[in-house]
A protein has these predicted regions:
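Catalytic, metal-anchored helix/loop core of enzyme active sites in primary metabolism
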Residues: 1-4, 15, 55, 64
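N-terminal Rossmann NAD(P)H-binding glycine-rich loop of SDR-like oxidoreductase domains
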Residues: 5-27
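Conserved Rossmann-like nucleotide-binding pocket used by diverse enzymes
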Residues: 8, 34, 59
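SDR active-site strand-loop-helix element
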Residues: 10, 36, 79-83
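Conserved glycine-rich Rossmann-like NAD(P)H-binding loop of the short-chain dehydrogenase/reductase
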Residues: 25-42
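Short alpha-helix adjacent to the SAM-binding motif of class I
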Residues: 42-49
Length: 88
């Protein structure tokens, strides 16, 4: 399903996002898997965990920033929306 496809996951560094990336890279061969999130540090940590995955890309942004989100979605085949505001 995701082989040779461009996938964008919003909230990609959250709990669901981390698991989605892990399972997708283990079970499919996406052309691009774009992790979209606001947290630069979590993106950096995630990148260290996947040093040999050329398909994995990172995009800093907030889903409330329409233009930034549209830019991230350019050429994307699938969007997995997992972004949320955490209120603790």
């Amino acid at each position: 399903m995701f082989d040779n496809k461009n996938i964008l996951i919003t909230g990609g560094t959250g709990s669901f996002g981390v698991e989605f990336v892990k399972k997708t890279l283990a079970n499919f061969k996406p052309k691009k898997l774009i992790v979209f999130s606001r947290d630069e540090m979590k993106q950096w940590e995630m990148a260290k965990n996947y040093p040999n995955h050329a398909a994995l890309r990172f995009f800093i942004g907030d889903v409330r920033e329409k233009e930034r989100l549209y830019r991230a979605m350019s050429g994307v085949d699938f969007v997995v929306h997992a972004a949320a505001t955490k209120i603790v």
